[in-house]
Amino acid sequence: MSAARRPGSVLVLARSGRMRDGHLAVVSRVVSSREIRVDHANWASGSLKGRIMRDQPVLDVSPRNDWSVVKVWYPPSGAYGVTAYPAAGFVHPRSQWAAR
């Protein structure tokens, strides 16, 4: 895993109190050193649960700007959520396939 974020990489949120299985989101774009946008599902509740949310903001709130703690946009409130989530890092797709 890496702290480097780029479009196509997968943000991995670690298991925590209310999020017993963790969460994955695909980076759609990098906005700044502290903000990315992601595509993900099952973040909201109620009628939005299960829907794929596209280009949703995620904010790095870690003290060292290392993407170890993030806040995620919560569509029903139209704002970042109150909870800060531990992030395990980013998984990057392979850019090349090994020759056979």
Regions found by a protein language model. Name each.
Residues M1-S45:
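...with weaker cross-activation on analogous glycine-rich loops/strands in unrelated enzymes
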Residues S32-R100:
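Aromatic- and glycine-rich peptidoglycan recognition patches
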